[in-house]
């Protein structure tokens, strides 16, 4: 089969302005709850897009760890490529692809670092193995073999066998403060429904976009 011949119809239903919540965070939480209840694989997985100092875009999958009225939170190694990008350009884009529900959410905004207290609160809630992995990996750095990483993990596991694991200085979180949030719902005959929430002077405005 040719790639150009791969297509399907979207039949889950449309999205109408009257059904939208006034606040996009409330609308996002409503859709996220439905994605979770539908038993989607990794419903909190999102594509995080950043750009380097030359304007070259990069994307990767990261898990959303919190969302509230202030924005969307994720955690990472502060030496990672994404964190280095955000140091010189805090503009960021998030994308949630909920394919089985024929939905997408696209977010643009600005990322800011979380406080040390916020980092510690989340880090200490993680399983011990996840804490050790965060400490063992210098994300995005070059390594000669997987064995180097596994060896470091085992070394740290032995070192902290009977004690608490400190929050690494090179690990932390970011909060993405949204400037726009677009909700996309697949529609019949490719007449998809798109609604864009844009923030102007502290208020959210909603516009329907052509598919």
Curated annotation (Swiss-Prot):
Protein's GO biological process: pyridoxine biosynthetic process
Assembly mode: Homodimer.
The parts of the chain that form a coiled coil are none
User: Enzyme class, one word?
Assistant: oxidoreductase
**How does the cofactor bind to this protein, according to its record?**
Binds 1 FMN per subunit.
Binding sites annotated in the UniProt record for FMN: 60-65, 75-76, 81-82, 104, 139-140, 184, 194
Taxonomic lineage of the native organism: Bacteria, Pseudomonadati, Pseudomonadota, Gammaproteobacteria, Vibrionales
The protein's gene is named pdxH
Pathway annotation? Cofactor metabolism; pyridoxal 5'-phosphate salvage; pyridoxal 5'-phosphate from pyridoxamine 5'-phosphate: step 1/1; Cofactor metabolism; pyridoxal 5'-phosphate salvage; pyridoxal 5'-phosphate from pyridoxine 5'-phosphate: step 1/1
Q: Which GO terms describe its molecular function?
A: FMN binding; pyridoxamine phosphate oxidase activity
Reactions catalysed, semicolon-separated, are: pyridoxamine 5'-phosphate + O2 + H2O = pyridoxal 5'-phosphate + H2O2 + NH4(+); pyridoxine 5'-phosphate + O2 = pyridoxal 5'-phosphate + H2O2
Q: Which organism is it from?
A: Vibrio vulnificus (strain YJ016)
UniProt keyword list: Flavoprotein, FMN, Oxidoreductase, Pyridoxine biosynthesis
EC number from the UniProt entry: 1.4.3.5
- Which family does the similarity line name? Belongs to the pyridoxamine 5'-phosphate oxidase family.
Role this protein plays: Catalyzes the oxidation of either pyridoxine 5'-phosphate (PNP) or pyridoxamine 5'-phosphate (PMP) into pyridoxal 5'-phosphate (PLP).
Sequence positions that bind substrate: 7-10, 65, 122, 126, 130, 190-192
What's the protein here called?
Pyridoxine/pyridoxamine 5'-phosphate oxidase
Cofactor entry: FMN
Q: Which domain of life is it from?
A: Bacteria
């Amino acid at each position: 089969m040719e790639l150009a011949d791969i297509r399907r119809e979207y039949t889950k239903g449309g999205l109408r302005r009257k059904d939208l919540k006034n606040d996009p965070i409330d609308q996002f939480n409503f859709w996220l709850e439905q994605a979770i209840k539908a038993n989607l694989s990794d419903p909190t997985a999102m594509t995080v897009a950043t750009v380097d100092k030359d304007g070259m875009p990069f994307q990767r999958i990261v898990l959303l760890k919190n969302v509230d009225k202030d924005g969307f939170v994720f955690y990472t190694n502060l030496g990672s490529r994404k964190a280095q990008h955000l140091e010189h350009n805090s503009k960021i884009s998030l994308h949630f692809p909920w394919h089985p529900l024929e939905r997408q959410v696209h977010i643009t905004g600005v990322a800011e670092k979380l406080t040390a207290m916020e980092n510690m609160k989340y880090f200490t809630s993680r399983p011990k193995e996840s804490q050790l992995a965060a400490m063992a990996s210098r994300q995005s750095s070059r390594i000669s073999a997987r064995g180097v990483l596994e060896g470091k993990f085992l070394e740290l596991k032995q070192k902290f066998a009977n004690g608490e694991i400190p929050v690494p200085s090179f690990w932390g979180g970011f909060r993405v403060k949204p400037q726009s949030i677009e909700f996309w719902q697949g529609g019949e005959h490719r007449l998809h429904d798109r609604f864009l929430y844009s923030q102007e002077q502290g208020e959210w405005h909603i516009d329907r976009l052509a598919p």
